[in-house]
A protein has these predicted regions:
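Extreme N-termini of proteins with methionine-enriched Sec-type signal peptides or N-terminal signal-anchor
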Residues: 7-8, 22, 38-42
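Metal-dependent phosphohydrolase cores
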Residues: 29-220
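Compositionally biased, low-complexity repeat tracts
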Residues: 11-17, 47, 77
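Cationic, low-complexity basic patches in intrinsically disordered or flexible, solvent-exposed regions
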Residues: 3-4, 24
Length: 220
């Protein structure tokens, strides 16, 4: 409605004798309105690593790129940064994928483990206690993650696949709490099928390994 009003006003003014298009553009109220429109538009999207503009609440699947996911997750820290040393979401996802490999899981489950936190590169992570108070956030997060699975796996996860991904993710969480925070829970530590090493890798190496696993298992 605002844009139509501006265009109508533009025709009115520019049509008057003695008012050129250049003079119209320099009028203070026109500069203010058009600048405000630009800010409103920019506030509706984020700019990704590869230069795409994505609206996290209404994403276009065609703009979701694995390069953006791998890059962003390699730079995001687990636990909102409340860890003894830096540990990226990308490293966590790679470990989940490797645990799935070690268990002999299907290529789909390996990829799902790799991508299970992919929504965080567009929406950021929210601590679980706070997330429980934000039902709309959880709805949007679930919608975006389903879209990512459908794009890269061909379809959403089955219940059995989702249960296995959640189990592996929870197992890694328990080890993260122990190693990165020194925090133990009442749960018995589950068995790991992979060798877990919390050595921090350079961001670029994490990004490249993420992409290697994705490429390898996308072909299976």
């Amino acid at each position: 409605m605002q844009q139509r009003s501006v265009m109508f006003r533009k025709r009115q003014i520019s049509g008057k004798k003695g008012i050129s298009g250049e003079e119209y553009q320099e009028m203070p109220f026109i500069r203010y309105i058009e600048k405000n429109q630009e800010r409103t538009t920019m506030s509706e999207y984020i700019t990704t690593y590869t230069g795409n503009h994505i609206n996290p609440t209404n994403p276009n699947p065609a703009l979701i790129r694995i390069e953006d996911i791998a890059h962003a997750l390699s730079l995001l820290c687990r636990g909102n940064g409340h860890v003894k040393t830096f540990w990226s979401v990308g490293q966590h996802c790679i470990c989940c994928a490797k645990e799935a490999m070690a268990r002999g899981a299907t290529a789909r489950v390996v990829l799902a483990c790799l991508l299970h936190d992919a929504s965080e590169c567009y929406m950021s992570d929210v601590p679980t206690p706070f997330k429980k108070k934000l039902p709309e956030y959880e709805i949007q997060e679930d919608r975006l993650l389903r879209m990512i699975f459908e794009k890269f796996l061909g379809s959403d996860l089955t219940k059995e696949e989702l249960d296995l991904v959640k189990e592996i993710d929870h197992t890694m969480l328990l080890y993260d709490l122990k190693e990165l925070l020194g925090e133990m829970t009442d749960e018995e530590m589950p068995k790991l099928h992979m060798e877990l090493d919390y050595m921090v890798q350079p961001f670029r190496e994490v990004e490249e390994e993420f992409l290697r696993i994705f490429t390898l298992y996308s072909r299976k």
